Amino acid sequence: MALIPTVAAFPLQRAFIPLLEALTAGLPRQFPALIHSIYLYGSVARGEALPGVSDLDITLLLNKPADSEALQRLEAWRQAFQLEQRIVSKVDFDIGSV
């Protein structure tokens, strides 16, 4: 049996809250049938991110495996979102399905 370790809850840094609100509102609105859940990890999740320096690490779980068209649409959304958000150096999506 494999165990997934859990980590302590860290408070989000105030500077990153608008970014996370935009992401968690925008992705499900744009992809309502596709997005199952959104997970944050890395320095932003730990409360150690540096504005303008740190990247945003996101795991997306989809309701089903994405076809090439869905992956292209997710990538286009990620690129546009990254250009709009100056507080992080880049936005990374790791994508899986349930």
Regions found by a protein language model. Give the residues of each.
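Alpha-helix initiation/capping motif
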Residues: 10-13, 67, 97
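Short amphipathic alpha-helical segments
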Residues: 15-19, 66-73
